Amino acid sequence: MGHFTEEDKATITSLWGKVNVEDAGGETLGRLLVVYPWTQRFFDSFGNLSSASAIMGNPKVKAHGKKVLTSLGGAIKHLDDLKGTFAQLSELHCDKLHVDPENFRLLGNVLVTVLAIHFGKEFTPEVQASWQKMVTAVASALSSRYH
């Protein structure tokens, strides 16, 4: 797990306060499903995922993306205990859903890309470094249940 400096925490929290969770969440999950199509197998119940436009316009993708980012927002308040914060989600994704833990890393990287697109020049290399540290730590926390 990454150690977060006070500067990291301030940088992450500051940008998070400006994130539109619904838009960024839907775009992040949508892009994951388009760029890494093998991840679609976990979302059979979401209906039409046959093309990029179908995925990006799918209301279930948008809703789940918002749910994912809402969960991430809660974790931002507990950066020093991400493993504890994500213990139940790790168990669910490992034991019940059998999600490949590599997918958490991919999703984090897609989120960083989406934030860069949304925030442009405000998403400086320093901001990116703090966010990359955070999504890496979250992916590690979500993978903690895996053996």
From Swiss-Prot:
Signal peptide: none
Residues at which heme b binds: 64, 93
Coiled coil: none
GO MF entries: heme binding; hemoglobin alpha binding; metal ion binding; oxygen binding; oxygen carrier activity
Tissue: Red blood cells.
GO biological process: cellular oxidant detoxification; hydrogen peroxide catabolic process
UniProt cross-references to Pfam families, sorted A to Z: Globin
Gene Ontology CC terms: haptoglobin-hemoglobin complex; hemoglobin complex
Residue positions, PTM S-nitrosocysteine: 94
Residues carrying Phosphothreonine: 13
Similarity comment: family membership: Belongs to the globin family.
Protein name: Hemoglobin subunit gamma-1
Organism whose genome encodes this protein: Gorilla gorilla gorilla
